[in-house]
């Protein structure tokens, strides 16, 4: 039976992190939006310690990843783990690895004393929503807004 293990990413893993980001973006039909570079990932994850990555490994081979960072909740006056990306290679799905990776993250939340474990999900991704609900996660009534690129510039420079 295959063995599932986890490990924290190291600086040498930056190319692999970017590879998983692109695989996820391709799955989400958003590959054309990826402008991340190895240099930027190294800077923010390892030089500035603004995010963390954990790999899921089957028999020592990286088959998925979780990319997360901290946010803050004023209501509970505590930090939250925000899961930005979760991805398991398609050929390894259906083995419980996604659930196991989420459980590993939940353990980190508990061990570090964070207030919440949260993430977002694309509206069209019903299979992921059902998966999260089957684990007991609650869907919240929030819409996500953001400025990026030109919309950010336009807002800053608006008269």
Where are these regions (language model features)?
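Conserved acetyl-CoA pyrophosphate-binding loop and the N-cap/start of the following alpha-helix
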Residues: 92, 96-104
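Conserved beta-strand-loop-alpha-helix junction that forms the acyl-donor binding cleft
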Residues: 119-128, 146-150
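Conserved beta-strand in the GNAT
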Residues: 55, 61-70
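A short helix-loop-beta-strand connector motif used in the catalytic cores of GNAT acetyltransferases and
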Residues: 43-55, 82
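Conserved GNAT-fold acetyl-CoA-binding loop/helix
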Residues: 18-43
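Conserved acetyl-CoA-binding loop of GNAT-fold acetyltransferases
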Residues: 114, 133-142
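Conserved GNAT acetyl-CoA-binding A-motif
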Residues: 110-120
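A short beta-loop-alpha structural element at the N-terminal edge
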Residues: 5-17
